[in-house]
Amino acid sequence: MYQDSFYILNSAFSLSEIEVGAHLYWEVAGLKLHGQVFIVSWLVIAALIGFALVGTKDLKQAPQGIQNFMEYVYEFLQDIAKNQIGEEEYRPWVPYIATVFLFIFGANWAGALIPWKLIQLPEGELAAPTNDINVTVALALLTSLSYFYAGLSKKGIGYFARYVQPTPILLPINILEDFTKPLSLSFRLFGNVLADELVVSVFALLVPILIPLPVMTLGLFASSVQALIFSTLSAAYIGEALEDHH
């Protein structure tokens, strides 16, 4: 009996161990990659693709079950793009906005719900890909490239006229804004996800039974909000690049 109790407590404490900065490195062409990030990212992507395949396997005129849920999700993501980019030009950008939202949402929830610490790695530990700054910076840079592409594809070289509007005095500030946008996107997402995981780990370490559950529930809500914020801001930046300045 005592051994069973000790085993349960020991398992709970092992789940709450805090390890920051340790990584499983894969060396590819002289580059060191964070292996645990790729593993969890691939699992999240596979889960999203699998869910999409199951949901579109037997499409019906009157949607039911998972098809009905998927159509609701699609309409929700479509509304994000439409509201931020505009009725006329939002459609080509729905796939990107939806992909960003679903990946961040899936990655955040995977990190919050799945007890990755039970899976032992030679180094580091599995966790939400979004608690790695490299992932959030990459996502933010994708958004930056997207709104540059949107502006240039519509306006050509004339897109750069926005840097001197409404007055050339604002040129340095407008240039600086292009650097602060990806910085704010990446650090906001990274900081919130990492802070949530650390708070849950600390609570689980101090009081491993039941007490962390409310914090985990709040973390799931915050994870969903972060996915919404990132995708909404991405759509807003693209919409800003597409709008006509007079």
From Swiss-Prot:
Listed NCBIfam families: ATP_synt_6_or_A
Main subcellular location of this protein, as a coarse class: plastid
Disulfide bridge partners, by residue number: none
A UniProt-annotated Pfam family: ATP-synt_A
Function field: Key component of the proton channel; it plays a direct role in the translocation of protons across the membrane.
Self-association state and partner proteins as the record states: F-type ATPases have 2 components, CF(1) - the catalytic core - and CF(0) - the membrane proton channel. CF(1) has five subunits: alpha(3), beta(3), gamma(1), delta(1), epsilon(1). CF(0) has four main subunits: a, b, b' and c.
Residue runs in coiled coils: none
GO MF annotations in UniProt: proton-transporting ATP synthase activity, rotational mechanism
Entry annotated with the keyword RNA-binding: no
Record carries keyword Isomerase: no
Top-level taxon: Eukaryota
Entry's transmembrane regions: 35-55, 94-114, 133-153, 202-222
Keywords recorded for this protein, A-Z: ATP synthesis, CF(0), Chloroplast, Hydrogen ion transport, Ion transport, Membrane, Plastid, Thylakoid, Transmembrane, Transmembrane helix, Transport
Family that this chain belongs to: Belongs to the ATPase A chain family.
InterPro entries: ATP_syn_F0_a_bact/chloroplast, ATP_synth_F0_asu, ATP_synth_F0_asu_AS, F0_ATP_A_sf
Bilayer topology annotation: Multi-pass membrane protein
PANTHER family: ATP SYNTHASE SUBUNIT A, CHLOROPLASTIC (PTHR42823:SF3)
GO CC term, one of those recorded: plasma membrane
Record localization: Plastid, Chloroplast thylakoid membrane
SUPFAM superfamilies registered for this protein in UniProt: F1F0 ATP synthase subunit A
Protein name: ATP synthase subunit a, chloroplastic
